A protein has these predicted regions:
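Acidic, surface-exposed loops and disordered segments
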Residues: 1-332
Length: 332
């Protein structure tokens, strides 16, 4: 998003194996108190139609550069997690074929005409509490959900060049013009696994793949599923991000962490959309994923709940002091 403001594009470079990236940036050398690794390599610059290739000579030259400075110690105490190290090794992407980078431009939107993006990026904060009273109009929710469709928002969803694999289970609490209950946003277009037979699957919007599953007050349910956190029930709407895990793993185990990347992209857009509307959002990392799967009637591991989120009017703690996120640079 920050690159797009400058007129640049950001794209994932797939032509170098992740394990080789550590050597390119010197993370495989002595002197590191903790094991560090490179997760991804990106191109940031003018728009290109095709992923550029990195020549072996360039890679060898980068790997031979001297390491400047000394690595910082990340923690006073280091705890070894061998199982996490094993999973990390299994999930590193190999060298992958290049892909075309040209994508269709996003559809223009007048949801927030004249609203500058830079201040939203600077002041974006996670809410700690929601007031439990504020509501939104259904038109605003539709605008938010339209923004989450990959074809509507190539920034940021075109960064990896991979198809969407994350759908959304919505807990609608206070949305004027939309009955409270459970909804499903089919943003990936992938085939759904069997779910509960009593779900309605009622299409509720001509412009969105949005379906009503079940009517009812879902505030207590959403709070309980998010580890009994009231913030999930006190917002206007909460959601669970469910990934098509089976389809991703068929392509390779390296797709697993990228499902979290996609959830992060969804969350970032929701943060900014909430700020633009004078509201706030917050990610919820503690939740009972087996109970979410049980709620939907999922009987296998083809889908998995990977992250939760909520949006509403924040209640700020007046004991906290706000400091500018990006203080002006000074020249002495």
């Amino acid at each position: 998003i920050a690159a797009a403001i400058q007129g640049w594009e950001m794209r994932l470079l797939r032509g170098v194996a992740e394990s080789a990236l550590d050597g390119l940036f010197g993370l495989d050398r002595d002197g590191f108190a903790e094991c560090e690794s490179v997760d991804a390599l990106f191109w940031i610059g003018p728009a290109l139609t095709q992923e550029p290739s990195l020549s072996p000579r360039l890679c060898e030259g980068l790997a031979a550069l001297p390491l400047a400075g000394a690595p910082n110690r990340l923690s006073r105490e280091y705890r070894d997690w061998p199982e996490l190290q094993r999973i990390h090794g299994l999930c590193r992407a190999p060298r992958l074929p290049a892909r075309r980078w040209r994508v269709a431009p996003g559809e223009p939107s007048n949801d927030n005409p004249g609203l500058p993006l830079r201040p939203l990026l600077h002041r974006r904060r996670s809410a700690q509490r929601m007031d439990g009273r504020a509501g939104i109009d259904v038109g605003l929710l539709r605008a938010w959900l339209r923004r989450l469709l990959p074809e509507r928002s190539p920034v940021p969803f075109a960064v990896t060049g991979e198809a969407a694999r994350v759908d959304l289970l919505l807990f609608v609490h206070r949305v004027r013009g939309l009955v409270p209950g459970l909804y499903w946003l089919d943003r990936s277009g992938l085939r759904r696994p069997p779910m509960r037979e009593d779900f309605l699957w009622q299409h509720v919007d001509p412009e969105l793949p949005l379906y009503l599953l079940q009517e009812g007050d879902a505030r207590a349910l959403s709070a309980y599923l998010s580890c009994q956190q009231d913030i999930a029930g006190d917002g206007c709407v909460a959601l669970a991000m469910l990934a098509h895990l089976g389809a991703a793993l068929e392509e390779g185990p390296w797709c697993y962490p990228r499902l979290y990347w996609e959830c992060g992209q969804v969350g970032q857009l929701l943060y900014l959309e909430a700020e633009a509307a004078g509201l706030s959002g917050t990610g919820i990392g503690c939740y009972y994923d087996p109970l979410v799967h049980e709620l939907l009637g999922l009987t296998d591991e083809s889908m998995a709940s990977l992250y939760h989120f909520t949006l509403g009017r924040a209640v700020w703690d007046t004991r906290l002091c706000n400091m500018p996120a990006y203080p002006a640079m000074r020249r002495d």
